[in-house]
């Protein structure tokens, strides 16, 4: 019997996503034994500083990639929004699964919407993208850093540290916590992180056997959308240091891509969008990025 080892972070959401991939692989390959290799990453361990301050979301990947290089794991499962725009050699993404809910969620025990929050309410999020959009919608809010896994963040809310917090809908839904969603924060008014809601599987590009096993999970229509979003982010040189948002959707045979760059300090937002061919997501991403630059995104980004 062939065995495939999946490196994964230890958080409940990461384990859910990895088990979801494992179940799909078992269905496609009935003779395949799939085991999880849970690991802790620096991004999980350092919770008293923002991701931007300690090196970015790539910290969630490095230990898992090292495990693959050492031969301790065959692949790794990630939230695609945490994956850097450029992968280090020799890594590739042979599978991007069908996208979950891309929206953000406002979670509060007392208030049913962003508009219902009282003047000066305390809202928890460490995402610069979320902070920028919150400041644009409600300049009066007090925004407070919030790190940790989904359950940790909810516990901090429940302990009274915040009036509300902002999380990804997909994470709450995958953990059976959809009832905690007070209000959805949806496109086009509120844009998600590039590739939010999508799960990706990473492996070594020189491992043809593993690549072949994983490729059957790839959802082509999802891949096209998230590649356009990531192409825009790449053209902007975006990272977790930068408040960048993007969302692509199918319109007939073409894609419609919306992009945003914002300021977490004062809530200035710059938007651009474009239609384009699904056959050239790179060009579509660059076109929306150029639209943002034409409206002053370079100056805004230079201030960060």
Swiss-Prot record:
It catalyses: 4 porphobilinogen + H2O = hydroxymethylbilane + 4 NH4(+). Belongs to the HMBS family. The gene is hemC. The porphobilinogen subunits are added to the dipyrromethane group. Pathway: Porphyrin-containing compound metabolism; protoporphyrin-IX biosynthesis; coproporphyrinogen-III from 5-aminolevulinate: step 2/4. This is Porphobilinogen deaminase. GO terms for biological process: protoporphyrinogen IX biosynthetic process. The lineage of its organism: Bacteria, Pseudomonadati, Pseudomonadota, Gammaproteobacteria, Lysobacterales. Its cofactor is dipyrromethane. GO terms for molecular function: hydroxymethylbilane synthase activity.
């Amino acid at each position: 019997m062939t065995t495939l080892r999946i490196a994964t972070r230890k958080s409940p959401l990461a384990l859910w996503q990895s088990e979801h991939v494992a179940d799909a692989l078992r269905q496609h390959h009935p003779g395949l034994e799939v085991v999880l290799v849970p690991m802790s990453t620096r991004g999980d361990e350092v919770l008293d500083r923002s991701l931007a301050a300690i090196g970015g979301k790539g910290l969630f990947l490095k230990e898992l990639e090292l495990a693959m290089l050492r031969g301790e794991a065959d692949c790794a499962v990630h939230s695609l929004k945490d994956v850097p725009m450029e992968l280090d050699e020799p890594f590739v993404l042979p599978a991007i699964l069908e996208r979950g809910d891309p929206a953000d969620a406002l979670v509060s025990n007392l208030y049913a919407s962003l508009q219902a929050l009282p003047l000066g309410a305390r809202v928890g999020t460490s995402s610069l993208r979320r902070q920028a959009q919150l400041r644009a919608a409600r300049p009066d809010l007090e925004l407070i850093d919030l790190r940790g896994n989904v359950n940790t963040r909810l516990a901090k809310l429940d302990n009274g540290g915040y009036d509300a917090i902002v999380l990804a809908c997909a994470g709450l839904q995958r953990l059976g916590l959809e009832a905690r969603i007070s209000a959805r924060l949806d496109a086009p008014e509120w844009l998600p992180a590039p590739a939010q809601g999508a799960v990706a599987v990473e492996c070594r590009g020189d491992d043809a056997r593993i690549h072949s096993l994983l490729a059957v999970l790839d959802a082509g229509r999802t891949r096209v959308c998230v590649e356009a979003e990531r192409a825009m982010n790449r053209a902007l040189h975006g990272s977790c240091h930068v408040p960048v948002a993007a969302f692509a959707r199918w319109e007939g045979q073409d894609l419609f891509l919306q992009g945003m760059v914002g300021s977490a300090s004062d809530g200035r937002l710059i938007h651009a969008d474009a239609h384009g061919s699904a056959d050239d997501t790179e060009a579509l991403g660059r076109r929306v990025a150029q639209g943002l630059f034409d409206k002053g995104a370079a100056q805004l980004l230079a201030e960060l």
